Regions:
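Second-shell loop/turn segments in exported
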Residues: 28-29, 47-51, 97
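Short solvent-exposed beta->alpha transition segments
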Residues: 40-92
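C-terminal motif of bacterial Sec signal peptides marking the signal peptidase cleavage site
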Residues: 11-14
Length: 131
């Protein structure tokens, strides 16, 4: 009987859909806010996991420094890869990898979103130069 309950729980965990489209919309929002310098709004809309890992002022400074020294202005982006990660324990995640063109360079951007109460929240972000 225990195995039946375990199987039932695993099946229920697998039924919860992860909305990749919502995560992609959040990437568009990220780029719009980046372009407008709305770094505090980005931070406030991020997951508690991200907010607990970096202060608001450090987050803002990282993005300002990225714009000034590495990236410049955002121009366009293309989705290269997407992955849904369903956890038995913890929040489900969507990982999106983009090739993005900025005025100073082309980068690979990796966005990690976690599903919190039905909404996709930014959990992690990084970029690496590809030119």
């Amino acid at each position: 009987m225990r195995y039946f309950y375990l199987l039932f729980i695993l099946v229920l965990c697998g039924c919860s859909p992860l909305d990749v489209n919502s995560a992609q919309e959040e990437v568009s929002r990220f780029h719009d806010f980046y372009q407008s310098g709305k770094y505090i709004e980005l931070y406030n809309g991020a997951s508690k996991t991200l907010q607990e890992s970096i202060s608001e002022s450090d987050f803002v400074n990282v993005l300002k420094r990225a714009e000034v020294t590495d990236l410049g202005k955002f121009q366009k982006t293309t989705l290269k890869s997407q992955k849904k990660v369903k956890h038995l324990i913890g929040s489900d995640e969507v990982v999106l990898i983009y090739a993005s063109v900025y005025s100073k360079r082309i980068v690979q951007e990796i966005f990690v979103f976690e599903k919190i109460k039905g909404n996709m929240k930014l959990k992690g972000y990084k970029y690496d130069s590809i030119n």
